[in-house]
């Protein structure tokens, strides 16, 4: 599972 923090880090 991908957490919100993980996603935002990839988006920058």
From Swiss-Prot:
Membrane-spanning segments: none
**Would I find Lipid metabolism among this entry's keywords?**
no
Report the coiled-coil segments. Answer: none
GO molecular function ontology, one term from the record = lipid binding
Taxonomic superkingdom: Eukaryota
Q: Does the keyword Transport apply?
A: yes
Question: Which of UniProt's keywords are assigned here?
Answer: Allergen, Lipid-binding, Transport
Family to which this protein belongs? Belongs to the plant LTP family.
Q: What does the record give as the function of this protein?
A: Plant non-specific lipid-transfer proteins transfer phospholipids as well as galactolipids across membranes. May play a role in wax or cutin deposition in the cell walls of expanding epidermal cells and certain secretory tissues.
Instruction: Name the chain's protein.
Output: Non-specific lipid-transfer protein
Q: Which organism is it from?
A: Foeniculum vulgare
């Amino acid at each position: 599972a991908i957490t919100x923090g993980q996603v935002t880090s990839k988006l920058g």
